[in-house]
């Protein structure tokens, strides 16, 4: 519920380390999804091309160019999203490792940051903040070997428990586990198999994490909302694109807030 005397600081200040020259859209979609999900302030740290596009696609977000970064940029931040469209090169690998090694801010780890993390599993052993990992099945196989879907569920629970993370294992009926409890999210549809959908989900989850939700709750609510928005778009469309899903977020949140009893996990 939005507070009468609330301000942008009330609803979370989040940093997105996202996007690169070839994957500008990932940063734009994640930022807009976070803004539409209610974040008070979204700052995107990325390259010049992404930032130029951001001012048109999501003028509500602030930005910082990639050549400039110091620890002061993370001061006062309530959550970080890292990896969506970040790109894979030596600079991004070094930065991801540095940030994940030292930050005490809750983090959503998505996309290319998951690929980098899989190359440096030692980071999983010694993290200092709450982590939410958002792999699809192929990305999860870089961490854990499994052959059958039934094995995947057990492996997901064991992985989350061992490394003290919240795992959002994306796919049909996305699985979420914190190692103690496991949830299947039943919202969503086959029309959502399109580019940018994962970036949108990561942006929503980062927003809820920054607003103060516990990692498990941010993951569950974010994934459920993402699926509901996709279901709404799918009613009138053969395919579902990420930008249309984002457009549904404020209206769907309004509906959920009015009818909380309809949310199956609250």
Question: Which residues make up each language-model segment?
Answer:
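Small-residue (G/A/S/T)-rich helix-start motifs and N-terminal tracts that mark the onset
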Residues: 1-106, 115-132, 137-266
